[in-house]
Amino acid sequence: QLGGPMTSGIPAYRLPLEGVMQEIQYILDSGVKAEVNREITDAAALKKEYDAVLVAVGVSKGKRLPLPGADLPQVYTAMDVLADSRAEKDLSYLGKTVCVIGAGSVGYDVARSLIRKGIAVHLTCLEQADKILADMDDQTEGAQEGVDLLPGRAFEAIEGAEGRVTGLRVHTVLSSTYDKATGQITEVAQEGSQTVIPCDSVVFATGQYTGLQDYENFGIELNGRGFPEVEEHRTSADGIFAAGDAITGISFVIKAIQQGRLVTSAIDRYLGGDGQIDETLVERTAQPEIGCIEHFGQLPRVEQELRPAAERIADNDDVYRTYSCQEAGCEASRCLQCDLRTQIQPMRLWSKFLPGGRVRSLPLPAMRPAHTDPAHAA
């Protein structure tokens, strides 16, 4: 399916499918030809068919820790489980209780997706509670939804009996350090803390990789992590470029979109263009009647209302309610690219951005407030 992790990985409660598919259709309607179910094993061979090739394969392969018992059939990677969940497949094969190893954003995606299927989840990680990699929203919302977080655990083995997973053997870690140069982890274990967390299956959310190193000769140089070696998106092979998570590792959707624009500019220059891909919009005269809010560039963000946890786990819908008309108007008033922007003086000193700093605007005739909301009176 087109869309990569947006349609086969990121949970629907975080990114509704309908909007993504609509965007994909816009792209197809513009004349882009998509070929699916075609495995590319040699980028250099593909280059013979085209003027340029872009490798944007993402990081769709999940990593597993080399634990005893990791080869049991009830052991999975986060990418496998998230793909099945996104496709609304039956997840009963996971059993009633699951241990998820890794408490980053992906680990929380798995845990919260399984909670919505009525599956109990123990989310475990080596990091202490204050060092967890997931953002605070995930941690708070996950706790509200029933995710059992077990931080500061080191993993010894996946236990099994009669060919089935029965639990995850761990011990408590008081502290740990990671040496980036050697990849070694040094831990201080709590004596006598070894225990087994009972579970029916184990899911690794311990990192992802491109999978390009699995091919005998993909045609471009890869670094030690299996990512393409690039310089301004150019790989080691002439006319072959790389972008997105395939060079940065897992990131945000908006970062991948930014990568797409940057590599498009690089490819355009390679093909003889100037690399300029920005749209030139029709010049319009500023409309003073839209109203002026003093210091509108520093108005706080209007936060969306979070649905109650009991309501959230009962479906896969967006966890946030939509803005009310008033809230939408307040948030839109913060736009820094509206017609009014052309009549605002730019900041000259960084100190202007500090608390208490003032933003001076040019005097405009016949101005009236865009909002009467007390929240914007300041």
Q: Where are the predicted features?
A:
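A conserved FAD-binding loop/helix module that cradles the flavin
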Residues: 243-277
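Hydrophobic/small residue at the entry helix of a nucleotide-binding pocket
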Residues: 2, 106, 248
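Glycine/serine-rich phosphate-binding loop and adjoining beta1-alpha1 elements at the start
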Residues: 28, 36, 43-84, 333-346, ...
